[in-house]
């Protein structure tokens, strides 16, 4: 299964192509908050560099926050447009849950993982997830 991942909740946009759980190609933006100008060219580059096309994609996953409100709107709108044009299913992914999933690889069962993101203005976005069967399954 090919998954096109789109992340625009932070200062830098990124796009990845994952096949059967393995990252095939990824690109990270180098210009702060330039998601609108760079996101679709990043998608094109990831597909081209991997030798893939939109016809190969089975699922589009887009980060739905928390994070930059404008970044989320750009990412979700772009992912939905791709989905509607191509008929590829699109799913929203929590930024915090994806961070917890990253940490779950090395965490013991029943470990509480608390991912946090800078919300600016001396605030944070945070969440708590217990790990079960190697996955963050319970939000606290």
Question: PLM features: what roles do these ranges have?
Answer:
Residues 12, 68, 123:
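Glycine-rich nucleotide phosphate-binding loop and flanking beta-alpha elements
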């Amino acid at each position: 299964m090919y998954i096109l991942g789109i992340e625009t909740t932070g200062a830098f946009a990124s796009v990845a192509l994952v096949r059967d759980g393995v990252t095939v190609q990824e690109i990270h933006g180098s210009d702060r908050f330039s998601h609108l100008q760079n996101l679709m060219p990043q998608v094109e580059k990831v597909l081209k560099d991997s030798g893939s096309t939109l016809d190969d994609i089975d699922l589009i996953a887009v980060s739905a926050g928390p994070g930059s409100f404008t970044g989320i709107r750009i990412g979700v709108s772009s992912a939905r447009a791709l989905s509607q044009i191509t008929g590829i299913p699109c799913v929203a992914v929590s930024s915090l849950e994806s961070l917890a999933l990253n940490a779950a690889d090395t965490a013991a069962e029943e470990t509480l993982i608390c991912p946090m993101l800078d919300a600016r203005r001396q605030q944070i976005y945070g969440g708590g997830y217990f790990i079960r069967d190697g996955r963050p399954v319970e939000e606290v």
